[in-house]
């Protein structure tokens, strides 16, 4: 990243942008944000266990990565267990392929480590180009569901179980 590109922590003020990023993450399946079951990934943002980072280019947000803890009775798509936060990541189409996804993922995994998490999980389409990025960061498949793979990455120096 150059001096005009940066990563910063997400805040409650970023919820509208996180909702926009859900459109980019899920546009292929649902037509409008209100019909996206994924809105659970930002509803009530700021609760314990929520953390995220925003990529900026020339001062404008162009991508986001965040995680949230889910309960067994209300899981996310990549749910593994109640102690493992589930990650969501998206970059606006015009900025893809420029390293933002890698920078976002690196920053968010560093944050998860610093907060003491041992693992993070996610769900990805089997044919998604992002699958290779996740594998480079140590994510491994734990189960397959329809056309998706639930993946988990172990984080060094996380809190013990």
Which role fits each region the language model picked out?
Residues 4-20:
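A short beta-loop-alpha structural element at the N-terminal edge
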Residues 56-89:
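Conserved acyl-donor/pantetheine-binding loop and adjacent beta-alpha core of acyl/acetyltransferases
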Residues 30-58:
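Active-site rim helix/loop that mediates acceptor-substrate recognition in acyltransferases
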Residues 112-125:
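Conserved GNAT acetyl-CoA-binding A-motif
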Residues 86-97, 124:
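A short, internal acetyl-CoA/4′-phosphopantetheine-binding micro-motif in the GNAT/acyltransferase core
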Residues 97-114, 135-136:
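Conserved acetyl-CoA-binding loop-helix of GNAT-fold acetyltransferases
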Residues 19-35:
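Helix-loop element at the rim of GNAT/NAT acetyltransferase active sites that forms part
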Residues 135-145:
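Conserved acetyl-CoA-binding loop of GNAT-fold acetyltransferases
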């Amino acid at each position: 990243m150059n001096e005009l590109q940066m990563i910063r922590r997400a805040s409650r003020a970023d919820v509208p942008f996180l909702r926009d990023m859900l459109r980019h993450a899920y546009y292929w399946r649902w037509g409008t944000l209100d019909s996206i079951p994924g809105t659970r990934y930002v509803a009530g943002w700021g609760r314990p266990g929520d953390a995220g980072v925003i990529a900026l280019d020339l001062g404008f947000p162009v991508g986001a990565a965040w995680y949230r803890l889910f309960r067994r009775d209300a899981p996310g798509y990549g749910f593994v267990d109640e102690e493992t936060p589930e990650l969501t990541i998206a970059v606006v189409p015009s900025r893809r392929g420029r390293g933002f996804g890698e920078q976002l993922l690196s920053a968010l995994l560093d944050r998860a480590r610093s907060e003491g998490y041992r693992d993070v999980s996610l769900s990805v389409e089997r044919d998604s180009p992002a699958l290779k990025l996740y594998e480079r960061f140590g994510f491994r498949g734990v189960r397959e569901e329809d056309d998706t793979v639930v993946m988990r990455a172990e984080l060094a120096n996380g809190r013990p179980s």
